[in-house]
From Swiss-Prot:
This is Teretoxin Tan9.6. GO terms for molecular function: toxin activity. The cysteine framework is IX (C-C-C-C-C-C). It comes from Terebra anilis (Auger snail). The lineage of its organism: Eukaryota, Metazoa, Spiralia, Lophotrochozoa, Mollusca. GO terms for cellular component: extracellular region. Residues 1-21 form the signal peptide. Residues 22-52 form a propeptide. Keywords: Disulfide bond, Secreted, Signal, Toxin.
Length: 85
């Protein structure tokens, strides 16, 4: 039969393993989210480097309709829409 100390130690080790697994899963989700943001930022930066202005959604609604050559581009999670003019 296991002593109280041994049972307590075993319980503690199991809790540590579960918490490490949970922390690892959360870390992977955070890294995936960071990667998506980097990819979106890189896409908008590339459009700016091509010599076109990138306008955020709040200005797109009015400017893209009035200016010729303005087209809406990628929807992102943080910023709904960008336009290229």
């Amino acid at each position: 039969m296991m002593s109280k100390t041994g049972a307590l130690l075993l319980t503690f080790m199991i809790l540590v393993l579960f918490s490490m697994a949970a922390a690892d899963a959360l870390g992977e989700r955070f890294e995936d989210h960071e990667q998506k943001i980097r990819e979106q930022d890189a896409g908008v930066g590339l459009l700016s480097l091509m010599g076109r202005a990138v306008i955020e959604c709040s200005k797109c609604d009015t400017d893209c309709k009035t200016q010729k050559g303005c087209i809406p581009v990628a929807k992102t999670t943080n910023n709904p829409t960008y336009c290229i003019c």
